[in-house]
């Protein structure tokens, strides 16, 4: 970078700057074939829960980094994007160094797709991979039949009255997870307000006798040709009954009914921790294959 460039923190992003950042993310996605940041970063653009680092060259936006603070045992996490026309100029390295100086050495720097430029930057900065998140996909055609589960009643999300049970199951099932664990009603409400939210694609499994929630599968539609297994959570007390597989297939059939009805092909994707070998094995049995890997880098040692 040169003396004409700047990398500065902003507490609040003006509306027009948020749009420029979205355009930057879109340009990088088109160039790389993979989005440089996750959906949560897009939700944070209008919030003050995270810190916003903006890189300018000659007054033009060329880079953006979002730094989420540590919380509930999770380290600080950063996601960044550099415009395709402004790479190999040290912008990414400068933003990462700035983020590490604020977040500390435990900060995780995410590289979505783990592309070669990201690996090279990480190596140059002395960062090593500490976490891998797999993206898996399969066609929505020719799905296996969802197996029955004795003593379970399946339903779809009825509204905020279901939130307390969803939170109980989610936070028990994902107590170990840096992003999915520790959810509050605000986390569900925020996603309920998203354009993609569809209560008919949010499946709940209740114990027929007690009425307690045993598990859930929240699906998401990205486009006319792509759906997602957004979250599958099973109460720790209900695991081992095949409920996760049944819920997954119920959601997959819902996505197939919705996306294949127009006669074109459609796929479904999901994200899973690379070291969650049981889940990866289950998804492989259901026909999913790894298509991409997101990697979190951190300071060595």
Curated annotation (Swiss-Prot):
Transcription among keywords: no
Biological process annotations from GO: mycothiol biosynthetic process
Molecular function (Gene Ontology), one example: protein-N-terminal-alanine acetyltransferase activity
Source domain of life: Bacteria
InterPro entries: Acyl_CoA_acyltransferase, GNAT_dom, MshD_Acetyltransferase, Mycothiol_AcTrfase
Residues reported in the UniProt entry to bind acetyl-CoA 2: 232-234, 276-281
Transferase listed as a keyword: yes
Protein name, per record: Mycothiol acetyltransferase
Source organism: Mycolicibacterium vanbaalenii (strain DSM 7251 / JCM 13017 / BCRC 16820 / KCTC 9966 / NRRL B-24157 / PYR-1)
């Amino acid at each position: 970078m040169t003396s004409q460039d700047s990398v500065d923190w902003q507490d609040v992003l003006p509306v027009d700057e948020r749009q420029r950042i979205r355009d930057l993310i879109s340009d990088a996605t088109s160039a790389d074939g993979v989005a440089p940041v996750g959906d949560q970063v897009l939700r944070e653009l209008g919030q003050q829960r995270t810190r916003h680092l903006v890189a300018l060259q000659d007054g033009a936006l060329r880079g953006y980094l979002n730094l989420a603070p540590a919380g509930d045992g999770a380290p600080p996490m950063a996601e960044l994007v550099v415009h395709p026309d402004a790479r190999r100029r040290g912008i990414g390295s400068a933003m990462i160094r700035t983020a590490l100086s604020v977040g500390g050495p435990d900060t995780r720097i995410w590289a979505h797709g783990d592309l070669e430029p990201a690996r090279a930057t990480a190596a140059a900065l002395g960062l090593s991979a500490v976490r891998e998140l797999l993206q898996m996909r399969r066609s929505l055609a020719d799905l296996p039949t969802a197996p029955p589960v004795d003593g379970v009643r399946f339903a779809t999300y009825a509204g905020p009255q279901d939130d307390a049970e969803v939170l109980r199951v989610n936070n028990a099932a994902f107590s170990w997870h840096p992003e999915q664990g520790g959810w509050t009603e605000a986390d569900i409400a925020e996603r309920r307000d998203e354009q993609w939210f569809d209560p008919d694609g949010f499946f709940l499994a209740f114990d027929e006798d007690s009425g307690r929630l045993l598990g859930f599968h929240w699906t998401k539609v990205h486009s006319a040709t792509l759906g997602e297994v957004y979250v599958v959570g099973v109460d720790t007390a209900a695991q081992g009954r095949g409920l996760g597989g049944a819920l997954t297939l119920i959601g997959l059939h819902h996505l197939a009914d919705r996306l294949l009805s127009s006669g074109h092909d459609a796929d479904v994707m999901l994200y899973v921790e690379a070291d969650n070998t049981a889940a990866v094995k289950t998804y492989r049995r259901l026909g999913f294959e790894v298509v991409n890997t997101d990697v979190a880098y951190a300071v060595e040692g």
